[in-house]
Amino acid sequence: MTQWLQSGRRRDICALLYDAGALHGQELKSTLEATYDTRIEPAAFYGSLDALVGRGLVTKRTDGIHDVYRLTDAGVGGVESHYAWLSERLDAD
């Protein structure tokens, strides 16, 4: 399993992007905060996003004044691989 999946926040960001396709950074942060039912420090959140972009798992583009994030093919593969791994654990008899 790749290193980014060892971080719960990064994994959850990727899962949200997998579901949504593409999201503005603030929209993604708000969705994650609602999921966790807690506030996430902006520096920590955007640090996680920057790490995902740096690893080639997420792309970042500018749309007006907003940054928009989307999974790359490698990011999609990572989410699907993790889902398969998790499903095997849950389906084990």
Q: For each predicted feature, which ranges?
A:
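Short helix-capping/hinge SLiMs at alpha-helix to coil transitions
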Residues: L17-A20, T35-Y36
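Short acidic, hydrophobic short linear motifs in intrinsically disordered regions
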Residues: L23-E33
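A short, conserved structural fragment
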Residues: V53-R61
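Short, hydrophobic-biased segments on the C-terminal half of alpha helices
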Residues: Y46-D50
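Short alpha-helical segments that sit at the start of domains
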Residues: M1-Y18
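Short, Lys/Arg-rich nucleic-acid/phosphate-binding segment
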Residues: T62-V68
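Amphipathic alpha-helical dimerization/coiled-coil segments
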Residues: E80-D93
